[in-house]
């Protein structure tokens, strides 16, 4: 099962700030200890995918409730980035919050795990990648997604994935996940493929 967490809830669910992980791949056992083993057993004992999804959804909701939420301003900034599909400027976010760019960068980085400018690029890339998978023309995707031109889109695709846009367009996991970042308040959505999004 794959679970994709919004960065706005990742700290609460994981029990550690994404900034502390610094992009490292960490085993769930290292984060949750024995609880990870119990979850693995429960998922293995479940008789259907629906039961596995229900178990996972309940676990995520419980951990989110018990965990430390991000600051409301940081959650608002993340949601604004997502709603704009990565087309908002960081200085606009800071101005709307009444914060300096430095304050926004510091709080956002410490709670979300990446600087706001990188988050903007990531969300813009994600939106563009999903449009490529949907079969849209790369030049049109680049223009509509706020890239200066197709070569800038190509550069971001290679930087984020290590492969070309044509390769990304054929990635099957993107075809079942219409968007990566839902609003932090949205309920989990499950798919028959075994992908659970929150």
Locate each region found by the language model.
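Alpha-helical bundle regulatory/interaction domains
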Residues: 1-101, 114-115, 130-133, 138-148, ...
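Long, low-complexity intrinsically disordered regions
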Residues: 91, 105-110, 114-120
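A secondary-structure capping/hinge motif
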Residues: 108-114, 156-166
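A periodicity- and composition-biased signal for non-globular, repetitive helical segments
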Residues: 127-130, 156
């Amino acid at each position: 099962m794959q679970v994709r967490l919004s960065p706005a809830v990742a700290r609460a669910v994981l029990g550690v700030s994404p900034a502390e992980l610094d992009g490292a791949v960490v085993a769930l056992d290292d984060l949750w200890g024995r609880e990870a083993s119990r979850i693995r057993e429960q998922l293995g004992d479940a008789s259907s995918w629906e039961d596995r999804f229900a178990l996972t959804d309940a676990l995520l909701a419980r951990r989110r409730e018990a965990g430390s939420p991000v600051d409301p301003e940081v959650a608002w900034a993340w949601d604004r980035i997502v709603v704009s599909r990565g087309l908002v400027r960081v200085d606009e976010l800071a101005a709307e919050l009444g914060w300096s760019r430095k304050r926004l960068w510091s709080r956002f980085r410490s709670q979300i795990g990446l600087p706001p400018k990188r988050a903007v690029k990531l969300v813009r890339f994600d939106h563009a990648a999903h449009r490529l998978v949907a079969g849209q023309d790369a030049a049109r995707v680049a223009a509509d997604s706020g890239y200066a031109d197709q070569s800038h889109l190509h550069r971001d695709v290679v930087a984020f994935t290590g492969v070309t846009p044509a390769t990304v367009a054929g990635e099957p996991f993107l075809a079942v996940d219409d968007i990566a970042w839902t609003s932090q308040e949205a309920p989990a959505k499950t798919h028959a493929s075994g992908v659970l999004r929150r």
